[in-house]
Amino acid sequence: MELWYTEEWTENVRFSIKVNKHLFEGKSQFQRIDVFDSDEFGKFLTIDGLMMVTYKDEFIYHEMITHVPMATNLNIKKVLVIGGGDGGTVRELSRYPQIEKIDMVEIDKMVVDVSKEYMDICSCKLDDKRVSLYFEDGVNFVKCAHDKSYDLIIVDSTDPIGPGEGLFSTDFYKDCYRILTDDGILVNQSESPYFDFNAKEMKRANKKLKQIFPISEVYQAHIPTYPSGHWLFGFASKKLNPVKNQDRNGWEKLSLKTKYYNSDIHLGSFMLPQYVKEMLDEE
């Protein structure tokens, strides 16, 4: 008998992966968490039936959400990660010696515990001495943080439903602005522009960021296991433009080995398809 994981992208579209084994299933006070093993994508973790991370393509998401802001400001020292319980974003941040402090705020401890056991490709740097883990609500953590206390905030959240909903609110973005330094950058995952539900949330988030931050841009990556494969990220800043202020030479001198991100991809990721540009221009 064959076992398949199937995720509903829309009422009319589903995405399936043939599964060898269902490695873990559990329910925290917030959400359902599952881990599967497959031939094509290796181990993968889902939350409430939605794909979060796979062994085969996780590097794309984690490199793009991390290296784009870092290559824009190589002087970043204090970083706040909201969500990111699998640890992949922290892993990429830990590669920068200039970073002194990484605070990771994950509402669901079970996500971290399960990732440590099954998704070690991502969670391998959560014990870095610069990393502090906080198991609490990210919205409240940001609200209580001191002014100008972080150089970079990465919102590595689930979709804007359930526990992740508040991380797409105007009040949350205003608090992020307040706790960022003058050269501070906020990056978030911004859903897909392709299917209507994802596109609606993407437009809402982008509109809110534009109202709060002087610089607000959108960039993209191809992530095969996310709905449509076309995924967007938001980049918001008080001063720094990710294209004009890209420190290509400085970043390349670090000689970081990557699988997806490079200096050309950095620039190219901001060159959006026409239909996405038009969506973002809609009031």
Curated annotation (Swiss-Prot):
It is found in: Cytoplasm. GO terms for molecular function: spermidine synthase activity. Its EC number is 2.5.1.16. Its main location: cytoplasm. Spermidine binds at residues 62, 86, 156-159. Residues 2-238 form the PABS domain. It catalyses: S-adenosyl 3-(methylsulfanyl)propylamine + putrescine = S-methyl-5'-thioadenosine + spermidine + H(+). PROSITE patterns: PABS_1, PABS_2. GO terms for biological process: spermidine biosynthetic process. It comes from the Bacteria. NCBIfam families: PRK00811.1 (NF002010), speE (TIGR00417). Homodimer or homotetramer. Belongs to the spermidine/spermine synthase family. This is Polyamine aminopropyltransferase. It comes from Clostridioides difficile (strain 630). The gene is speE.
